[in-house]
Amino acid sequence: EGCGVTAIETAGGAVVGVVTERGTIRTRRVICAAGATSFRLLDGVGIRLPQQAVRGTCMRTNVLPDVSASTIWGHGLGIRQRRNGTINLADDMQVDVDLTLGHLRGLSLFWPQFWSQREKFRLRLNAAALRDVCARIGGAAGPIEPRDPQPQPNRAHAPRALAKLKAIFPALKDAQIVEAWGGLIDVLPDGIPVIDAPGTPSGLAIATGFCGHGFAMGPIVGRLLAEWVDTGEPSLDLSAFRARRFVDGTMVRPRSML
């Protein structure tokens, strides 16, 4: 804990260890599940992954009358009422893209989906671009810096989300936004993750690019990866989640992404 991994070490086409801030750990098995920074570790072993990150904003209201115990998404709003009566909400899946030079990676694969849903993205040129340039010039340790980015929410979403909530549920006329927070979502061009043991280098397994659905998929993916590492074969066919789909032309463009 608190020790960053900077590289996956290989020899003779096989994993032999991971390089960390505190030295090298020898191992013949590595699961790369480093979220939005997985592409950096994989790049070091010759696997090019067109992975990006977008910044989402969520909000929480004051305590309100009961609406529903279910998660609701529609009419440009997603909501979930908590047991204490407050409501978590987000505005129509709109996300911010903090532009950096890294966004050139996989651009041709992302572009069709971006253009077809461009109203859901807000392109931002801000301090993230400067930090990216400085890191590239100074040779900063990209996989572990910043260690805890704490992305800021886009508070411009709050009044829109609140107005939609009151329009959908007129009984919630006293609703107010009391908290907002931001988070990074790692994304891949087709909206589905990479869950793979590519074979080169041997001993490597990958689980990344969950596009905001990792919390729900975590238990089954963890079980399948454990099977893969233990027996060499998962109990389900995971061929659709291969990392090579982005380079061998088998990636299927999605009609929509949620």
What are these regions (language model features)?
Residues 1-5:
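A conserved beta-strand/loop element that lines the FAD pocket in flavoprotein oxidoreductases
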Residues 8-133, 144-155, 159-168, 172-173, ...:
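Flavin-dependent oxidoreductases
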Residues 12, 17, 30, 80, ...:
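Short, flexible coil/turn micro-motifs enriched in small/turn-prone residues
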Residues 25, 186, 216-217:
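Substrate-binding strand-loop-helix patch
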Residues 57, 65, 182, 242-248:
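Acidic, glycine-rich active-site loops and adjacent beta-strand->loop/helix elements
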Residues 137-143:
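Short, basic/glycine-rich phosphate-binding loops at helix/coil junctions
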Residues 153, 157-212, 248-251:
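A glycine-rich dinucleotide-binding beta-alpha-beta segment and adjacent secondary-structure elements
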Residues 190-258:
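C-terminal lid/capping helical subdomain adjacent to the catalytic/cofactor pocket in oxidative enzymes
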